[in-house]
Regions:
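Transmembrane alpha-helical segments and their short flanking loops
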Residues: 39-59, 76-78, 96-99, 110-186
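Generic multipass alpha-helical transmembrane bundles of integral membrane proteins
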Residues: 1-84
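A residue-level detector for conformationally permissive "hinge/kink" positions
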Residues: 8, 93-96
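Juxtamembrane helix-boundary/capping and inter-helix hinge elements in multi-pass membrane proteins
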Residues: 84-91, 114-120
Length: 186
């Protein structure tokens, strides 16, 4: 399920269709129910573990790790454009897309670069959310980071802050690692 969810959002965006809205509309209620189930486990006084019925894939999973800095996790591309692009146009676009990207809004990059209908940028754009989702899933499954409780933050909460708010310092560190990885993937 993580792979399908992670693939569909950027795949739809590649064609100019708002993937987060389409996929979120279909799976959002399930992810929110999973978040509430995790909160119920905590409210009952039990430890939030898989053995106690904890759910790994929640709304926080999607918002803070699959769609962080926007669909396709484009902050790596933005950083590359700002510091390493040879074209003045790309540098300027990176600067313009940087602040919105920190609030998980990346349409300036999607349409300005363009990533939409660009097969060369489609590969990292589609791959990065899958990589992020798999790293997070296995990190939670083996206990490197805690499961998501019921804490929900708005999807526009900046990265690292959002990781800390929904999962503590370990989640913020993992989110930082994944964001750094996005630079190398792009």
């Amino acid at each position: 399920g993580v792979i399908v969810m992670s693939l569909m959002i950027p795949f739809l965006w590649f064609f100019g269709i708002h993937g987060s809205t389409i996929v979120g509309g279909i799976i959002g209620s399930v992810l929110t129910a999973n978040s509430l189930a995790n909160q119920a486990i905590l409210d009952s006084g039990m430890a939030l573990t898989i053995e106690n019925g904890g759910r790994i894939v929640t709304q926080q999973f999607l918002d803070q790790f699959i769609n962080v800095t926007g669909a396709g996790m484009t902050i790596g591309l933005v950083i590359y454009m700002i510091f390493f692009a040879k074209s003045a146009q790309c540098k300027e676009l990176g600067r313009l897309g940087g602040v919105p990207g920190l609030f998980n809004i990346n349409e300036p990059i999607l349409f300005g670069t363009p990533i939409v209908m660009n097969p060369f940028l489609a590969i990292p754009f589609i791959a990065m959310p899958v990589i992020s989702g798999l790293i997070l899933y296995f990190s939670i499954a083996v206990g490197l980071v805690p499961m998501f409780g019921g804490v929900m933050v708005p999807w526009t909460t900046p990265p690292i802050v959002s990781g800390f708010l929904v999962g503590g310092w370990k989640m913020a560190v993992l989110q930082t690692f994944i964001l750094a990885l996005s630079f190398f993937v792009y």
